[in-house]
């Protein structure tokens, strides 16, 4: 299964590369390189709930993974799993994700959030995710239930930590599962809570 995942990602990269060569683009670790490419949607193959995408050479963003999905990604070099789901949500998952991740030799970063006072979307979450990205020794999986929260966190990370313009960050997150019509309350979006300010207030150079 992991061979098919790699082939799909490589094929997508080749379709846009003038050289026709699938080249690596690191986004994790202390020595990440280059600009952030657009996500590539991959077939979930029943291993991830609803959404599965790859960004660059070493970041995956998805809905809830199955046991086999985690095993396949480990075989692909994933060393860090970042989970945004709340404890009640994880209680409904038919296996112990934290235990499996550790059993497979990966680091488990648990950042539960629901947009509630108890589990808020906050700038601290972006900081924690950025630390996980820079500290990763290999590839990273970021997931929630259907990649909606993950898409908003990814957009905030791009804006806050990678100096990606707001419009570009939102467009790339839409390619995963941003869904602008789903909001926290009124007109507020999770990405704004992650940033700690409205998108219209984001500094010059990131609009």
Describe the residue ranges of each PLM region.
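Bacterial N-terminal signal peptides
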Residues: 9-18
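Cys-dependent protein tyrosine phosphatase-like superfamily
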Residues: 22-140, 155-207
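A phosphate-binding catalytic loop at a beta-strand-loop-alpha-helix junction
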Residues: 141-153
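Coiled-coil-like amphipathic alpha-helices with heptad-repeat character
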Residues: 2, 20-21
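Bacterial N-terminal signal peptides that target proteins for export
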Residues: 1-9
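Helix-centric, low-specificity signal for extended rod-like, repetitive segments
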Residues: 18-19, 142
């Amino acid at each position: 299964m992991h061979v098919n995942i790699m082939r799909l990602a490589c094929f997508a990269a080749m379709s846009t590369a003038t050289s026709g060569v699938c080249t690596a683009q690191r986004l994790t670790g202390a020595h990440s390189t280059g600009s952030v490419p657009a996500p590539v949607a991959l077939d979930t193959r029943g291993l991830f709930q609803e959404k599965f995408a790859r960004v660059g050479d070493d970041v995956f963003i998805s809905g809830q993974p199955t046991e086999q999905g985690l095993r396949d990604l480990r075989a692909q070099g994933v060393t860090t799993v970042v989970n945004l789901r709340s404890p009640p949500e994880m209680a409904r998952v038919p296996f112990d994700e934290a235990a499996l991740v550790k059993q497979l030799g990966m680091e488990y970063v648990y950042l539960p959030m629901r947009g509630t006072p108890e589990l808020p979307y906050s700038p601290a979450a972006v900081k924690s995710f950025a630390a996980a990205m820079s500290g990763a020794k290999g590839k990273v999986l970021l997931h929630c239930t259907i990649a909606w929260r993950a898409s908003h966190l990814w957009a905030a990370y791009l804006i806050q930590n990678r100096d990606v313009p707001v419009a570009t960050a939102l467009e790339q997150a839409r390619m995963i599962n941003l869904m602008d019509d789903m909001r926290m309350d009124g007109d507020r979006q999770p990405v704004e809570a992650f940033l700690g300010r409205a998108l219209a207030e984001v500094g010059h150079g990131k609009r």
